[in-house]
Amino acid sequence: MSDGIVIIGSGFAARQLVKNIRKQDAQIPLTLIAADSMDEYNKPDLSHVISRGQKADDLTLQSAGEFAEQYTLRLFPHTWVSDIDAENRLVKSHDNQWRYDKLVLATGATPFIPSVPGRELMLTLNSQREYGAAQSQLHDAKRVLIVGGGLIGCELAMDFCRAGKAVTVVDNSASVLAALMPPEASSRLQHRLTEMGVHLMLKTQLEGLEQTADGIRVSLDRQRAITVDAVVAAAGLRPETSLARHAGLQINRGIVVNSQLQTSDPAIYALGDCAEINGVVLPFLQPILLSAMCLSKNLLAQAGELKLPPMLVKVKTPDLPLHLAGDTRRDDLTWNIVAAKEGLVAKGVDAENQLRAFVVSEDKMKEAFALLKQLVS
C-alpha cells in the first residue's frame, strides 16, 4: 500500500506545499516525516528573539497535532530518515518505511560551521530546536561574538545589541552583506551597526576557540584575541543534500531541479532551501511560496512551470531596514547612490543604463515596488 505523496521536512516550504495541495485535493494521502517536533513557528523571528526576551517555546504558532488534523495528514515527528530507495520508491528510517507515489525533499539547509579548533563551542540559530538548546547561554551572555557579517549575522548583531549585549562581528570580507551587495550600498548599515556599539572586525580570519575560566577565548589572525561568553555561527547555510546524494540524484550547490521542481528522478521533487533552481539556491520566502504553488500542481498532474519574477529580499535590521532586488553582485554594474536623512536609494545600471539591481533603506523602502517594475532581468 502506498503512502501517497511523502514529504521529508516540516518547515515553511513543506507547510506551504501541504496548504496548496489541500486547496486542490482534500483526499490524496499526504505523509510528512521530519527529525524535529513538526510544530509550526516563524523562522525569521529567530533574528529577534533575544531583544524580545522570548524562549524557544514562545515561538510555536501551531502544534504538529493541530496541523495534522487541520490538513488531514499522517505525521512522523522526531524521525530521522536514513535512506531513500529510489528504485523501489521507499523512504526508510531505522524502524519504519514508507512507500511513495511521489516524494518531495524539503530538507532545508544546515549552518556552515568554520573548521577551526574549538568549533564545537559555536552555537547556531537556524531552527527553533537549535535556539532551544542555546537560549540559556545566549540570554546569560554579556559578550557575544557573531561569526559572519552577512544577512543573518547583521540581523543577529543588531538584535543582540538592542538587548544590551557587547557584540563583536568577525568576517573575512571588507564590508557587511558582502555576498548580497557592493560596499557602497551596505555602508549605511555598517555605519549604523558601529554607531549602535557593534564592534565590526572585518577582513579578519577566525583561527580558533578555547574555553577558559573567563569565557571563550577567540583567536584571530595577526596574533589578536578576544574573550566572549558565547559564539554564534552565522557564516551562511548549505543546502541539505545528503539524502538526495545517497539516492543518486543530481547535486550541484543544491538538489538540482527543473522548472517543474522535479529532480533527476521523475518521481522525486525538491523544494525550498535545499533546491537549486536554474543554477541558483534561493533561501527566501517569496520564491518558496511560488515554488510551493507550482509544485502542488505538478504533484496533482496539473502541469505547472515555475516562473520567478524579480523579487524583494528584506534585511530585517529594525534600526536600519533594507530591501534589495535584482543581481546586486554583478561586477559590471555602475551604482548610482542617493543618500538622504530619510534613507538610501542605490541603483545598479548596466552599460545600456538599464536597471539591473537596487537597494533601498528606511523610508525609501516605499520606492521598492516601483523600482521592481523597472528591473530588467
From Swiss-Prot:
One of its GO terms (molecular function) is oxidoreductase activity, acting on iron-sulfur proteins as donors, NAD or NADP as acceptor. It catalyses: 2 reduced [nitric oxide reductase rubredoxin domain] + NAD(+) + H(+) = 2 oxidized [nitric oxide reductase rubredoxin domain] + NADH. It is found in: Cytoplasm. Pathway: Nitrogen metabolism; nitric oxide reduction. InterPro entries: FAD-bd_OxRdtase (IPR050260), FAD/NAD-bd_sf (IPR036188), FAD/NAD-binding_dom (IPR023753), NO_rdtase_NorW (IPR023961), Rbx-bd (IPR041364). Its cofactor is FAD. One of at least two accessory proteins for anaerobic nitric oxide (NO) reductase. Reduces the rubredoxin moiety of NO reductase. This is Nitric oxide reductase FlRd-NAD(+) reductase. It comes from Klebsiella pneumoniae subsp. pneumoniae (strain ATCC 700721 / MGH 78578).
